[in-house]
Every structure is written in C-alpha cells, then in structure tokens.
A protein has these predicted regions:
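Non-catalytic structural scaffold of enzyme domains
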Residues: 1-211
Length: 211
C-alpha cells in the first residue's frame, strides 16, 4: 500500500494504526528516506506524558501493541518515574466496528477493562479504534482523569511535521478526500462512517490490490 500511495505523489505518510506502527515504522522510514513518515505511537506517548500529573498512565490497546512495549518504553524514556500500566482491550475493536460504542454492552466492557485501575490520572487510547469510546470513558472515570487520544495527537504532530518541511498548502480552498481500500467498499463505507462520523460517498472509495 505504501508503494501505491507514493505513486499517487503523497507528500507525507501516516501509519494510522498502533500495531502497524510498532511493526513497520522503522522499515518504511528507511525505505522512503525522502518522504516524511509518521506513526501514532510517539505522538501518543508524548501527549500522555504532557497530560499526566501524578506520573501514572494507563494504556488501553491491543495485545500486540502492548506486547511490543513501545508505549511503555517511550513514556518511561520521557518520564523515568512514570508508572505505566496496560490493558488489552481486544473486544473493543469488534464493538467499534459494529458501531456499539455507547450502549450497555460497550459500557460493561469498558467497566470491566477499567476495573483494576484506580490510581492513574491519564488514560491513553493506544488503538485508533478506541476514540469512538472517548465520551463513554469520560463519563466512567473519576473527575480529573484525562483521556488522551493518540490519533488526535498524531494529527497535531503531522501538522507540525508538514510545517517544518514547508509542505503545508497555502490554498484556501476545500480539499478532497480519496480513500484507497484493500477490502470490501461496502464494509468500508459502513465502518468508516462510524469512525469519521459522516457518511462516505462510494465514488470517493477505490479498491486497490496492495499485494
């Protein structure tokens, strides 16, 4: 997929998945030395460190991301005294893709995952599926606990990266969005609408062979 995107003359590449970032970021950065390549883990870790006041952070992520240890290592590298706890929340991925983000099933799952953690003042959403649960989480956690979205932090990091490389467009016009997918267009329309909060035009979606 990266090759296809480069052929489309992109000016920056974001690996918008925590698991893929831990697995592929160094490789893609070495393969594409002339292209700014950004993952979601470093911006997320930086945002968590900036947010925490008691240096106790809970990372909600997939088992693969947690096993890689990237968030734990990056947070502790920036804040050596930090206590970083982790919770694998694989069920949330399926719930998110079904649009079940604020119903009783989702709330019970969130309560289950949060049950053993009471001292952290910062919760880092370490999976790009999880921002759809942010509002529900904020209602469940005690007042003062901050829920940090690694995706939002990455968007800010991308803006700064583009600025540093003088790649920010000066046009005041409204841009267009084109989606390249490797699976069902219909499924992408359904699931994408959940995450983006708006319906997706099928004409803007292109099925490509990334093999």
């Amino acid at each position: 997929m990266a090759k296809i995107l480069v052929e489309r003359r992109i000016k920056a590449l974001v690996i918008a998945c925590n698991t893929a970032t831990t697995a592929a970021l160094p490789f893609l950065q070495s393969m594409l030395p002339d292209l700014p390549v950004l993952g979601v883990v470093v911006p997320g870790a930086q945002a968590a460190v900036a947010a925490t006041r008691n240096q106790r952070v809970l990372v909600l992520a997939t088992e693969t991301t947690i096993a890689a240890g990237a968030y734990q290592n990056l947070i502790k590298a920036q804040c050596p005294k930090a206590v970083v706890n982790t919770q694998a929340c694989s069920v949330l991925v399926a719930l998110a893709e079904e649009g079940m983000t604020d119903n009783p099933v989702a709330l019970e799952a969130l309560k289950h995952y949060l049950g053993n953690f009471t001292t952290e003042d910062t919760i880092l959403l370490g999976c790009t599926h999880f921002p759809v649960f942010k509002k529900a989480l904020e209602h469940l956690v005690p007042e003062g606990v901050q829920v940090v979205d690694s995706a939002q932090a990455t968007a800010q990091a991308l803006k700064e990266l583009l600025r540093q490389n003088e790649l920010i467009t000066m046009s005041e016009g409204v841009g267009t969005i084109h989606y390249l997918v490797t699976d069902s267009i219909n499924r992408f329309q359904r699931v994408g609408a959940i995450f983006l909060g708006t319906s997706l035009n099928a004409e803007a979606i292109e099925l490509v062979d990334a093999c």
